[in-house]
């Protein structure tokens, strides 16, 4: 894999500086889900990238399918919901992203005039990130639903929230991303006692070199500030 070779070459250049004739910054290609990119990722890696003179080539994939990029050898690492690593890689649990079912007050008044009930959710328009996003399906199944539901597709974390605020549908939104909207009452939680947690794992190549190892240590430490710990 090209990424692995480059990372090992970087380690050699660190030991023998004369080999690093160009002195260019290293670049890592990493796959991660859009919600991580929109919330905790930047703060988790910002200072590290500056210190290590590291450039990132980020590839956005749903957390359920990001591992396919590792399997194809296209990325050096990925953040995804799958625990089992591909051959030649390791995975480490970072924590869980907590999602809450939210809607605008106007949407709730229009679709739930007598109060929100779990069995009614599948009969109202929802918002789904993309064709690989089955989080709403899992959520409805946990409430006893077993069929399809009407939904909009919105492949943007920021746009997802804007559409929810505009009353187009209800959606499962990262708690990290909407604390201000919840405080202001712009968005309201439909079922306050029923969040859904999505575990996030960091996958990286075993022979990824020192830089990837340092980045792994940084993510394990810093992710605790934002993600929900899992037993």
Region annotations inferred by a language model:
Residues 62-63, 80-85, 104-105, 156, ...:
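Beta->alpha turn/N-cap motifs
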């Amino acid at each position: 894999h090209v990424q692995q070779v480059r990372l090992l070459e970087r380690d050699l250049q660190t030991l023998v500086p004369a080999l690093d004739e160009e002195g260019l910054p290293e670049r890592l290609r990493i796959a991660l889900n859009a919600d991580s990119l929109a919330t905790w990722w930047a703060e988790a890696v910002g200072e590290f990238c500056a210190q290590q003179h590291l450039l990132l080539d980020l590839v956005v994939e749903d957390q359920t399918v990001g591992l396919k990029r590792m399997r194809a050898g296209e990325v050096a690492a990925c953040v995804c919901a799958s625990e089992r690593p591909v051959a030649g890689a390791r995975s480490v649990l970072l924590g869980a992203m907590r999602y809450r079912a939210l809607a605008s007050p106007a949407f709730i008044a229009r679709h739930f005039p007598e109060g929100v009930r779990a069995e009614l959710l599948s009969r109202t328009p929802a918002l789904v990130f993309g064709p690989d996003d089955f989080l709403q399906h899992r959520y409805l199944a946990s409430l006893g639903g077993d069929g399809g539901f009407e939904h909009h597709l919105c492949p943007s974390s920021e746009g997802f929230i804007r559409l929810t605020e505009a009353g187009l549908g209800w959606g499962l939104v990262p708690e990290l991303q909407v604390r201000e909207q919840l405080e202001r009452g712009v968005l309201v939680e439909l079922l306050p006692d029923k969040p859904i947690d999505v575990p996030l794992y960091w996958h990286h190549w075993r022979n990824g070199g020192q830089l990837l190892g340092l980045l792994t240590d940084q993510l394990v430490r810093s992710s605790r500030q934002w993600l929900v710990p899992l037993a």
